[in-house]
Structure formats: structure tokens, C-alpha cells
Design a protein with these regions (language model features):
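Interhelical loop and helix-boundary elements at the membrane-water interface
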Residues: 1, 37-62, 105-130, 163-195
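Multi-pass membrane catalytic core of lipid/isoprenoid biosynthesis enzymes
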Residues: 1-22, 114-148
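Structural signature of hydrophobic alpha-helical transmembrane segments
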Residues: 21-32, 85-88, 148-155
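Transmembrane alpha-helical segments that form the membrane-embedded catalytic/substrate-channel core
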Residues: 32-45, 64, 68-69, 87-102, ...
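Hydrophobic alpha-helical transmembrane segments in multi-pass integral membrane proteins
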Residues: 65-77, 138, 186-198
Length: 198
């Protein structure tokens, strides 16, 4: 209420912001919603991160809201193709969480933390992980311009290499090694996309 009141007073004081007050309030509500979602992910009486909804939250907040929100903030509109990039990044970020959850299946079940990986079990969680990887690669392939073939190759090789190591060893040590490897792959991917846009 206090933030809304301050924004309203600011909009009244500066006439050029008057038309944008609805947009400002929308951003404030989005930020408050994101903060509440971050808090209730592992806190509160029924944390949704431990009920199997964490992957969906990561897809939504790190993919759709992160990418589309940034585009709208800078451009003032949403490009239809941006949904593919947002979904691709959301899937890759969900893969990071899934790796962590696959590694922790036994301890999560003992602590009654029923993540999606814990609910699925390791073999099905690996299959789910593979589907996310392949769908993300298809989204990147469809989204990237034809002249950016090196990015398609990078994403394809990174995905296949990652899945090879996921299935090559069945120890938790492998999952522990794959977590930072895939996190750095996602970071490198975002850096390459940024360089492409500069």
C-alpha cells in the first residue's frame, strides 16, 4: 500500500509518468509476487519447492519472467519469438535444479522433501532431464537465426555431452560433477547470446 501510494504521488507530481502509473504498479506487483514466490519456495508451513513444484517455479521465474520481463522492460513490447528463448532458458535452468534434486533424492526422501526428482525416482528423473534438454535444444534451434549456426552447434554438443555423462555413470559423484558443469554451460550460453546481440 505504501509503495502504491508513493508511486501514485510521484505520478501526480510528474505528468509524464501519469500515463505509466499502471505499468509501474504492474512491475511493483510482479516484484512483490517474485519475492513471495522466492520466500515460500522453502519457507512457510507448506513450501512448494518440497512438494514437487520447484521445477515449474524455476521455469517460470528464470525462464519466462526473466527473459520476457527483461525484454518488455527494455523494448516496451514482447516479440513473438522471444517465448521460445524464454522457454529454452527456463528448461535449462530447470535442468540445474533437477540435477541438484537427483543428487539429493535419498536425503530429500529421508527429510520428507518430495521434490519432483524424489517423486519420480532416479531413472524417471533422468528421462525427464533428457526430455527437458532435448526440448530446450529444439527451442534454441527454432529461435536462432540461420546465420548463427555456431550457437546451434554449441548448444547441441553441450546437450549431447551432458546427457552422455548423465547416463555413463550411476553414482551420485557424477551428478555432483554435472551440477557445476551444466550451470557453467548455461552461463556460457547466456554470455554467447549477449555477445551476439552487442
Amino acid at each position: 500500500v505504501l509503495c502504491s501510494s508513493c508511486l501514485y504521488l510521484l505520478a501526480q507530481a510528474l505528468p509524464n509518468l501519469n500515463a505509466a502509473v499502471g505499468t509501474w504498479l504492474g512491475w511493483v506487483l510482479l516484484v512483490v509476487g517474485c519475492l513471495a514466490a522466492a520466500f515460500y519456495y522453502t519457507a512457510g508451513s507448506r513450501p512448494y519447492g518440497y512438494r514437487g513444484w520447484g521445477d515449474g517455479a524455476v521455469f517460470l521465474f528464470f525462464g519466462l519472467i526473466g527473459v520476457l520481463g527483461t525484454e518488455y522492460l527494455h523494448a516496451g513490447l514482447l516479440n513473438q519469438d522471444s517465448w521460445m528463448a524464454a522457454a529454452g532458458l527456463g528448461l535449462w535452468c530447470s535442468m540445474v535444479l533437477n540435477l541438484n534434486n537427483m543428487r539429493d533424492i535419498e536425503s530429500d526422501l529421508a527429510a520428507e522433501k518430495y521434490t519432483l526428482a524424489a517423486r519420480l525416482g532416479l531413472p524417471c528423473a533422468k528421462a525427464y532431464h533428457s526430455l527437458m534438454a532435448l526440448f530446450a535444444w529444439l527451442l534454441w534451434w527454432a529461435w536462432l537465426p540461420l546465420g548463427q549456426g555456431y550457437l546451434i552447434i554449441f548448444s547441441g554438443v553441450a546437450t549431447m555431452w551432458h546427457l552422455y555423462w548423465l547416463y555413463s555413470d550411476h553414482t551420485l559423484f557424477t551428478l555432483d560433477k554435472l551440477l557445476p558443469q551444466w550451470s557453467l554451460t548455461v552461463l556460457a550460453w547466456v554470455a554467447l547470446l549477449w555477445l551476439m546481440c552487442v
